């Protein structure tokens, strides 16, 4: 993602990409995401046919700054043609603003080192040996806090029966998605709320770690937050640091770009929703040695199909 991002920072409005792509989905979801997250046209010209045992899928296309396909040659040889409007002002309300002060750690490039050697020898928190494990995600759209609470408990019990070690539930699953400050205040849950004790007991009983989203209240302030409930009884909270325009109506921004959580099966990086569009944040978590990105998210009706 750094190439398109740098091109956009230098003022490019159109990204022209000759491709050797053999992914089955065409146009690729990756192309759509690069267009959406950077607010620029992507013109991707891909090869078609077989060469030396490789099947190139074709699917050349033109994608607008909203991530919508405006022209595509889905199969075989051919040309995709479209008019593009460089005066188009894409809707950026669902893309959080960047916070460069949180990304200073990106200058510490650890990739020249073998990951295991670096983190065992120099890191303040050495990596644990990774393990193969089962994880689960659930799509839940509750209408209120009570309904969401029951759905979460059912999901935890089901994950436990399946032998899953990690369960990731949606953003704001406890309470719902607020439109304004007043709604958020009604949905808010404190860290000392009895709901966490009950859910933690269920988590320990089912031997599964659970990550879910909710509105956090603390000292009269509200955050879009994630709760990480671990099977050892510990609880961890992440306050979303990159807010959309809608979220900024009611939420404070957190002070950390992502949360790092060590578990016996690997190191987890936690983000929330549209923060995945801010490419610096998952890169930071990768630099910190995360094996897994857990991203509770809520449906975004403004995103075209194919964009995460």
What are these regions (language model features)?
Residues 40-41, 47-132:
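C-terminal beta-strand edge segments of enzyme domains
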Residues 44, 60-62, 80-82, 212-214, ...:
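Short beta-strand scaffold segments in enzyme catalytic cores
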Residues 21-40, 145, 149-240, 246, ...:
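Cys-nucleophile CN-hydrolase/nitrilase-fold catalytic domain and related Cys-dependent amidase chemistry
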Residues 124-146:
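Short beta-strand segments enriched in small/hydrophobic residues
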Residues 10-11, 38, 65, 206:
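Short, structured coil segments at secondary-structure junctions
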Residues 10-12, 131, 161-165, 208, ...:
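Short, high-confidence coil segments that cap the C-terminus of an alpha-helix
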